[in-house]
Amino acid sequence: FNDVGQSADFFLRTLEDDASNVALLRQAFLTQYYYGDIEQAAALGRQLEGLNVVVPLGGEPATALALRNADWPASIVLADRIAEDGQALAMAGVIRGWSLVAAGQGDAGISALLEAGRMSIDVDSGMPPFFRLHAALMAERLGLVNEALQRVTGLEADSLPSHVALDLAAFYARRQKWDIVDRLIDTQLSRQFNQTDVRAALEQGTRELPAIQQYIAAAVVALALSDNKNSGQSLAARLRFALFVDDDHHFARLLLAQQLSDYGQTDIALANLERIPDGGMFGQLARLAESAVVEEAGDSERSISLMKAVADRDPGNAYLFHRLGDTYRRNSMFRQSRNAYMASLALGRDTGGLHRSLGVSLERLGETQAAETHLLRAIEIDPGDAYALNYLGYWWADEGRKLDQAIAMIERAVSHRPSSGFFVDSLGWVHYKLGDPARAVGYLERATELEPSDPEITGHLGDVYWALGRREEAMFKWRLALTLSDDAEEQALLERRLRTGLTPCLLYTSDAADELRS
């Protein structure tokens, strides 16, 4: 998937020289679909059909073409072809249902949709809620308002995915039931959404019914997200399908951009995010995603600028100031991160994650008493917060304070995250600080197995080996740590270790500054 664009081009060019190669034809079809060239994929799909070759997703690009062109009779026929893929029966039913409604066969359309819903029933959770919603939307489209309202009665009280909640809110907005709309916005949407923008977009959307293509695109996305068996490539294909049918489906574009970013296609991801305008239902989510993508790409200045703009636009949203603080903290701007976290607290946010992150920033600023207060508050809110437990425990152990409490905290952190080399390192290091290198060595050896490229952990193991009299092994670990480190102070400390070893006065200490001065 990382090179799907190049793959699509490669298979298409190769096919020119070997047009009868069915294997190449299949790969060319799939990569064109995943890449988003629906028209080319549809043409290749017709070639495969002419050869009586069945391929997964085979009928979908041609169906997308028919839907975009509002060729409802063709869409109905092509939906039956999609159904030949046993994994796409529900998608076929949704497309067939809406196409029948568009063709004036409303009752048959609702029946086809609900039959698809019955095929999607989960033993634990029942029928996915968007089937009920789309049955109501079909009834609304047919002018059967009372039936539509009846079909979604009580649905707003269920736990709904945000995209389903927004489509339900849009339905109630068209019915002028603003109390339900506001309840959906308040209870079903995360704080990543700008609630004012969402409300304004819903008000604007009351002027006319969406096009049939918009309903189908929304249903295809909802169906793809509800299918836990969907591979990343299948999800990408369905998102491309939805965007081909409805180019303004901002939620599908947001999801596609996030997926592209996950696979390292930063420029294409950003190009998609930039097509989602500020405001509206998904503008704020797009800017948050954009900030994350550019930070991952190494542009911290732009990431911070985007985050500040989002927070300025939605100044009463405590979540945004928490996230802005995280962006500052990851860039070692601890004074700014502290201020952002304090703004989030002032707006009423009181989560363990916020107190932990604020505590870390305060500790890095030397405000130790306040830092401990917030780290302890994080643990009070979430006694299983392994990061807060490890951070506070390691801090105390590294400074030789409250060692019994420190080791108990780190043991709790390791019990929650036994595969974290950093937490296992902390546990070994505190035993070393307590003067028990024999007990520490097993933990530190395990930590280096879990995090073999971390210079600090590797250096810790070298210290323990030295304390145990295993001098050659200690030297080896310090040399390895030196090659792994890019920190000047750490490199100087390791070079000193390699020249003189650990003198008795430095055993079981960790004050690098004192060691470098000695």
Language-model-derived ranges and their functions:
Residues 17, 50-51, 85, 119-123, ...:
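Structural marker of alpha-solenoid helical repeat scaffolds
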Residues 23, 57, 91, 127-130, ...:
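Start-of-helix register in tetratricopeptide repeats
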Residues 27, 61, 95, 131-134, ...:
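Canonical tetratricopeptide repeat
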Residues 30, 64, 98, 134-137, ...:
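Residue-level recognition of tetratricopeptide repeat
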Residues 33, 67, 101, 140, ...:
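Position-specific recognition of the canonical hydrophobic site in helix A of tetratricopeptide repeat
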Residues 508-516:
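Conserved small/polar residues in nucleotide/adenosyl-binding loops
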